[in-house]
Protein backbone atom coordinates (compact mmCIF):
# COMPACT_ATOMS: atom_id res chain seq x y z
CA UNK A 1 0.00 0.00 0.00
CA UNK A 2 1.15 3.53 -0.80
CA UNK A 3 2.05 5.75 2.14
CA UNK A 4 1.15 9.38 1.44
CA UNK A 5 2.04 12.36 3.60
CA UNK A 6 0.49 15.75 2.90
CA UNK A 7 1.81 18.85 4.67
CA UNK A 8 -0.45 21.90 4.39
CA UNK A 9 1.02 25.35 5.00
CA UNK A 10 -1.36 28.25 5.43
CA UNK A 11 -3.07 30.77 7.64
CA UNK A 12 -6.04 30.75 10.00
CA UNK A 13 -8.32 29.26 7.34
CA UNK A 14 -6.54 25.93 7.82
CA UNK A 15 -7.87 25.74 11.37
CA UNK A 16 -11.51 26.08 10.37
CA UNK A 17 -11.91 29.17 12.56
CA UNK A 18 -15.38 30.61 12.10
CA UNK A 19 -16.87 27.28 10.99
CA UNK A 20 -19.64 26.06 13.36
CA UNK A 21 -18.78 22.49 12.34
CA UNK A 22 -15.08 23.02 12.98
CA UNK A 23 -14.12 21.30 9.74
CA UNK A 24 -12.87 24.18 7.64
CA UNK A 25 -12.07 23.51 4.01
CA UNK A 26 -9.29 21.09 4.88
CA UNK A 27 -11.51 18.82 6.98
CA UNK A 28 -14.05 18.70 4.17
CA UNK A 29 -11.37 17.78 1.65
CA UNK A 30 -9.94 15.14 3.96
CA UNK A 31 -13.40 13.60 4.39
CA UNK A 32 -13.53 12.95 0.63
CA UNK A 33 -10.37 10.83 0.55
CA UNK A 34 -10.97 7.26 -0.65
CA UNK A 35 -11.43 4.77 2.18
CA UNK A 36 -8.59 2.37 2.87
CA UNK A 37 -5.82 4.67 1.66
CA UNK A 38 -2.85 5.48 3.90
CA UNK A 39 -2.94 9.29 3.73
CA UNK A 40 -1.72 11.43 6.63
CA UNK A 41 -2.46 15.18 6.76
CA UNK A 42 -0.18 17.58 8.64
CA UNK A 43 -1.72 21.09 8.74
CA UNK A 44 0.73 23.80 9.81
CA UNK A 45 -1.22 27.03 10.28
CA UNK A 46 0.26 30.42 11.13
CA UNK A 47 -1.96 33.46 11.63
CA UNK A 48 -1.16 36.69 9.72
CA UNK A 49 1.76 35.15 7.84
CA UNK A 50 3.10 36.79 4.69
CA UNK A 51 5.02 35.02 1.92
CA UNK A 52 8.39 36.06 3.31
CA UNK A 53 7.63 34.41 6.64
CA UNK A 54 6.17 31.39 4.87
CA UNK A 55 9.35 30.98 2.85
CA UNK A 56 11.45 31.20 6.02
CA UNK A 57 9.61 28.48 7.91
CA UNK A 58 8.46 25.97 5.33
CA UNK A 59 11.58 23.78 5.20
CA UNK A 60 12.17 23.54 8.94
CA UNK A 61 8.54 22.61 9.60
CA UNK A 62 7.53 20.60 6.54
CA UNK A 63 10.58 18.45 5.89
CA UNK A 64 10.62 16.96 9.39
CA UNK A 65 7.10 15.62 8.76
CA UNK A 66 8.05 13.87 5.55
CA UNK A 67 9.56 10.41 5.35
CA UNK A 68 11.92 8.73 2.88
CA UNK A 69 9.50 5.80 2.95
CA UNK A 70 6.45 7.85 1.93
CA UNK A 71 5.26 9.89 -1.02
CA UNK A 72 5.56 13.49 0.09
CA UNK A 73 3.16 16.25 -0.94
CA UNK A 74 2.98 19.94 -0.01
CA UNK A 75 -0.09 22.18 -0.17
CA UNK A 76 0.67 25.90 -0.03
CA UNK A 77 -2.49 27.80 0.94
CA UNK A 78 -1.66 31.45 0.33
CA UNK A 79 -3.15 34.39 2.21
CA UNK A 80 -3.33 38.06 1.26
CA UNK A 81 -1.18 39.22 4.19
CA UNK A 82 1.50 40.55 1.84
CA UNK A 83 -0.86 43.48 1.29
CA UNK A 84 -0.83 44.50 4.96
CA UNK A 85 2.91 43.82 5.15
CA UNK A 86 3.53 46.25 2.30
CA UNK A 87 5.25 43.56 0.25
CA UNK A 88 5.55 44.41 -3.44
CA UNK A 89 4.00 42.08 -6.02
CA UNK A 90 7.49 41.37 -7.35
CA UNK A 91 8.70 40.28 -3.91
CA UNK A 92 5.55 38.20 -3.33
CA UNK A 93 6.13 36.41 -6.63
CA UNK A 94 9.80 35.85 -5.83
CA UNK A 95 9.01 34.42 -2.38
CA UNK A 96 6.51 31.96 -3.82
CA UNK A 97 8.84 31.02 -6.67
CA UNK A 98 11.69 30.34 -4.23
CA UNK A 99 9.47 28.14 -2.07
CA UNK A 100 8.19 26.11 -5.04
CA UNK A 101 11.68 25.71 -6.49
CA UNK A 102 13.02 24.62 -3.09
CA UNK A 103 10.24 22.04 -2.81
CA UNK A 104 10.98 20.70 -6.26
CA UNK A 105 14.66 20.28 -5.37
CA UNK A 106 13.58 18.32 -2.28
CA UNK A 107 11.47 16.01 -4.45
CA UNK A 108 8.20 17.26 -2.94
CA UNK A 109 5.10 17.59 -5.13
CA UNK A 110 3.26 20.88 -4.63
CA UNK A 111 -0.32 22.14 -4.98
CA UNK A 112 -1.16 25.82 -4.46
CA UNK A 113 -4.39 27.37 -3.17
CA UNK A 114 -4.75 31.09 -3.84
CA UNK A 115 -5.96 33.88 -1.52
CA UNK A 116 -9.64 34.62 -0.94
CA UNK A 117 -11.58 37.90 -1.25
CA UNK A 118 -12.58 39.80 1.89
CA UNK A 119 -15.67 41.63 0.63
CA UNK A 120 -13.96 45.03 0.75
CA UNK A 121 -13.76 46.37 -2.85
CA UNK A 122 -10.65 48.49 -2.29
CA UNK A 123 -8.77 45.70 -0.51
CA UNK A 124 -10.00 43.05 -2.93
CA UNK A 125 -8.63 45.01 -5.88
CA UNK A 126 -5.20 44.42 -4.37
CA UNK A 127 -6.00 40.75 -3.71
CA UNK A 128 -6.89 40.43 -7.39
CA UNK A 129 -3.42 41.66 -8.44
CA UNK A 130 -1.75 39.42 -5.87
CA UNK A 131 -3.76 36.41 -7.02
CA UNK A 132 -2.80 37.06 -10.65
CA UNK A 133 0.87 37.28 -9.69
CA UNK A 134 0.72 34.03 -7.74
CA UNK A 135 -1.09 32.29 -10.59
CA UNK A 136 1.57 33.33 -13.09
CA UNK A 137 4.39 31.99 -10.91
CA UNK A 138 2.62 28.66 -10.44
CA UNK A 139 1.56 28.29 -14.08
CA UNK A 140 5.15 28.78 -15.27
CA UNK A 141 6.11 25.75 -13.18
CA UNK A 142 3.17 23.64 -14.38
CA UNK A 143 1.87 23.26 -10.83
CA UNK A 144 -1.83 23.10 -9.99
CA UNK A 145 -3.30 26.37 -8.74
CA UNK A 146 -6.71 26.85 -7.18
CA UNK A 147 -8.02 30.33 -7.94
CA UNK A 148 -10.32 31.12 -5.01
CA UNK A 149 -10.51 34.83 -5.66
CA UNK A 150 -12.42 35.01 -8.93
CA UNK A 151 -15.09 32.37 -8.17
CA UNK A 152 -15.79 33.89 -4.72
CA UNK A 153 -15.47 37.65 -5.27
CA UNK A 154 -19.17 38.03 -6.14
CA UNK A 155 -20.57 34.91 -4.46
CA UNK A 156 -23.40 35.98 -2.15
CA UNK A 157 -22.92 33.15 0.36
CA UNK A 158 -19.20 33.83 0.67
CA UNK A 159 -19.56 37.60 0.95
CA UNK A 160 -22.36 37.35 3.50
CA UNK A 161 -20.18 35.30 5.85
CA UNK A 162 -16.86 37.14 5.56
CA UNK A 163 -18.38 40.62 5.80
CA UNK A 164 -20.31 39.71 8.94
CA UNK A 165 -17.32 38.14 10.76
CA UNK A 166 -15.07 40.44 12.83
CA UNK A 167 -11.95 38.86 11.30
CA UNK A 168 -13.47 38.39 7.82
CA UNK A 169 -13.50 34.61 8.21
CA UNK A 170 -15.91 32.39 6.29
CA UNK A 171 -18.42 30.06 7.90
CA UNK A 172 -19.90 26.75 6.88
CA UNK A 173 -20.89 27.91 3.39
CA UNK A 174 -17.57 29.59 2.65
CA UNK A 175 -15.40 26.70 3.76
CA UNK A 176 -17.58 24.38 1.71
CA UNK A 177 -16.96 26.55 -1.34
CA UNK A 178 -13.17 26.50 -0.88
CA UNK A 179 -13.27 22.72 -0.44
CA UNK A 180 -15.31 22.35 -3.63
CA UNK A 181 -12.82 24.46 -5.58
CA UNK A 182 -9.87 22.42 -4.27
CA UNK A 183 -11.55 19.08 -4.99
CA UNK A 184 -12.44 20.14 -8.52
CA UNK A 185 -9.05 21.52 -9.55
CA UNK A 186 -7.17 18.26 -9.91
CA UNK A 187 -6.85 17.28 -6.25
CA UNK A 188 -7.34 13.54 -6.69
CA UNK A 189 -5.20 13.40 -9.83
CA UNK A 190 -2.42 15.24 -8.01
CA UNK A 191 -2.42 12.64 -5.25
CA UNK A 192 -2.81 9.78 -7.71
CA UNK A 193 -6.07 8.71 -6.08
CA UNK A 194 -9.46 7.82 -7.53
CA UNK A 195 -12.41 9.85 -6.28
CA UNK A 196 -15.13 7.70 -4.75
CA UNK A 197 -18.68 8.00 -6.07
CA UNK A 198 -20.64 10.07 -3.54
CA UNK A 199 -24.07 9.14 -4.91
Task: Give the role of each language-model region.
Residues 117-199:
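Catalytic His-Asp segment of secreted/periplasmic serine-dependent ester chemistry enzymes
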Residues 1-47, 59-70:
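Serine-esterase "nucleophile elbow" of acetyl-processing enzymes
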Residues 77-81, 99-132, 155:
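Active-site segments of SGNH/GDSL-like serine hydrolases
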Residues 5, 72-75, 109:
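Structural motif
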Residues 25, 29, 61, 92-99, ...:
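A general structural detector for well-ordered alpha-helical segments in enzyme core domains, enriched
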Residues 19-22, 51-93, 118:
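Oxyanion-hole/transition-state-stabilizing segment in secreted/luminal serine hydrolases
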Residues 13, 44-49, 76-84, 139:
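Cell-envelope and extracellular/periplasmic
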